[in-house]
């Protein structure tokens, strides 16, 4: 059968019309060298700093170094899956993580992927991990309290919503315990319906043992605190790149609450290991080392993270993000590089001492050098009324105590002051995982400052406090309710409290 030229032309036209001309243009480079979680890539001329690249195996990388003829990227995963000569393609995206309430109650990795075996997270919103901190006009001053439930902190070193308060101390001095107690203490607020009272919590584990993280998750589940808590975990066995980005990812998750008129608390545990992970990455990328071999921008590493914690203005929804960074010192040396950096960035520090810890003063807070620069504005009036003189009295007690070691003959007035100081120290002690509601803290500190404990033997102070609070909860609930609702001690309430305490002390000392 002979085809006419016109028919041939028609067939060709139909075939040409069916051809899909859409071709995808991809920028592809090649891995020159790989090792220690770092890949040097050749051929990605237009790649940006902070961009995500994808290796042949599907593992992602983050570009940090832009050099003349190659780029340096950190591998966010197992570097054994990346081989020399592998193709690498640009994604033209920066790192994003899922955010929102769907993450609450879950344990996720640094990239926001669930690692608790409870299935996928149905999150509709994603945010970049690196966000610009709010400007001065967008912020307002700190004015609402974050109740930690710890007497020594809420009375002497109060923390406000939007504040950055550093928890610093040697290993095994109870830094994480303070953070976990603060999370557990938010349970009371979450039982209320008012959204403005609630604080959502984010705990970031950086470079910790998996067993430690599992222990914290178990403790929070037992206390019923996981319902409003999210845990971001980048453990010691994970790539340094993941330990480096974990705090930024978690901060973006916290900013979702801050920017939607809610309140969030984020705990970075700990930023010492974060700085070590960044140092490792920087040295492997052959960046010039500075003091203690940290790179020159290690201050900016933490300042750009902690500046994202803020109390937003009314025009921006009045939300807040409070940060509690943790730093581990070596033999109490707070003048090392990273501790001094973070002290200068934050709005105060809670200093924990191993010496106090071993003496049985727990939480082992050194009240003398701990400070809260903005939190006192957020402290409720009732706490100011009772705790105003405690810091001074404790400072005088420490001074007298050190003098009394040299001589045995003390005049009666000094002896009375030392005995009073010892009882104040005793009343500020507290068991782990037992945060107190603020109204009960106020009653306990009132008892200490008004010298009701002078007749109580020192070793019975704890027993006295437990029995007194049990009695007041059962029979004098109106006193606690009045302090809670009025947020100050009215004359009427004080009279009731005095009458109750005078009777109780008589009964107890009998």
From Swiss-Prot:
Bilayer topology term: Peripheral membrane protein
GO cellular component: plasma membrane; proton-transporting ATP synthase complex
Site (described: Required for activity): 370
CDD domains, per database record: ATP-synt_F1_alpha_C, ATP-synt_F1_alpha_N, F1-ATPase_alpha_CD
InterPro entries: ATP_synth_asu-like_sf, ATP_synth_asu_C, ATP_synth_asu_C_sf, ATP_synth_F1_a_nt-bd_dom, ATP_synth_F1_asu, ATPase_a/bsu_AS, ATPase_F1/V1/A1_a/bsu_N, ATPase_F1/V1/A1_a/bsu_N_sf
Ligand binding (ATP): 169-176
Protein EC: 7.1.2.2
Taxonomy, superkingdom: Bacteria
Recorded GO MF terms: ADP binding; ATP binding; proton-transporting ATP synthase activity, rotational mechanism
Subcellular location: Cell inner membrane
Annotated keywords: ATP synthesis, ATP-binding, Cell inner membrane, Cell membrane, CF(1), Hydrogen ion transport, Ion transport, Membrane, Nucleotide-binding, Translocase, Transport
Reaction(s) catalysed by this chain's protein: ATP + H2O + 4 H(+)(in) = ADP + phosphate + 5 H(+)(out)
First-listed, main subcellular location of the protein, grouped into a coarse class: membrane
Similarity comment: family membership: Belongs to the ATPase alpha/beta chains family.
NCBIfam families tied to this protein: atpA, PRK13343.1
Quaternary structure note: F-type ATPases have 2 components, CF(1) - the catalytic core - and CF(0) - the membrane proton channel. CF(1) has five subunits: alpha(3), beta(3), gamma(1), delta(1), epsilon(1). CF(0) has three main subunits: a(1), b(2) and c(9-12). The alpha and beta chains form an alternating ring which encloses part of the gamma chain. CF(1) is attached to CF(0) by a central stalk formed by the gamma and epsilon chains, while a peripheral stalk is formed by the delta and b chains.
Role, per record: Produces ATP from ADP in the presence of a proton gradient across the membrane. The alpha chain is a regulatory subunit.
Name assigned to this protein: ATP synthase subunit alpha
Lineage, top ranks: Bacteria, Pseudomonadati, Pseudomonadota, Alphaproteobacteria, Rickettsiales
